[in-house]
Regions:
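Acidic, metal-coordinating catalytic segment for phosphate/diphosphate chemistry
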Residues: 1-18
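Active-site beta-strand termini and strand-to-loop segments that position acidic
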Residues: 21-24, 94-96
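Conserved Nudix-box catalytic region and its N-terminal flanking loop in Nudix hydrolases
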Residues: 22-61
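Unchanged
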Residues: 45-69, 76-129
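Divalent-metal (Mg2+/Mn2+/Ca2+)-assisted nucleotide/phosphate chemistry catalytic cores
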Residues: 136
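Short acidic DE-rich linear segments
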Residues: 139-140
Length: 140
């Protein structure tokens, strides 16, 4: 899989949002009920929803975040090596001050990490996006 980052607004139309979340100075990842792997918060942008609205909704649904600051970081585009399947979206960074309960219908748990774990749901996308933050000197 190939993943590339772009300046915010370069791609114009977005299908997904990805939220790179930090809580207490650590990376906050979620684990879906149907998987044993870890992932950032994010998902589809609904019809008539802005990327920011989608990011806030997904952040709450998948982490339980109730007090936070959030801002766009970059756009991303990802495609399989054979170019048959791809996705694009806007990436946000969230600094979470307070977590509430997560929706148990979708997520099994959230966990704090010092660094990205090996067992990521999207191993060809997630490290690229976090590395972008490091390159921009914008990590926590």
């Amino acid at each position: 899989m190939i993943t590339k980052t772009y300046s915010v607004g370069d791609l114009k139309k977005y299908k997904y949002v990805v939220v790179l979340s930090y809580c207490n100075g650590k990376i906050l990842l979620s684990r879906h009920n149907d998987r044993s792997t870890w992932e950032t918060q994010g998902g589809h942008i609904e019809e008539n929803e802005t990327p920011l609205e989608a990011a806030k909704r997904e952040l709450f649904e998948e982490s339980g975040a109730i007090e936070y600051s959030i801002a766009p970081v970059c756009d991303y585009w990802s495609v399989t090596e054979d170019m048959s399947h791809g996705s694009n979206g806007m990436v946000f960074k969230a600094l979470i001050n307070k977590l509430g309960k997560i929706s148990e219908s979708e997520m099994a748990e959230v966990r704090h990490f010092d660094a990205l774990p090996d067992n990521l749901t999207y191993p060809a996308i997630t490290p690229v996006l976090f590395n972008y933050l490091v390159q921009m000197n914008d990590e926590v």
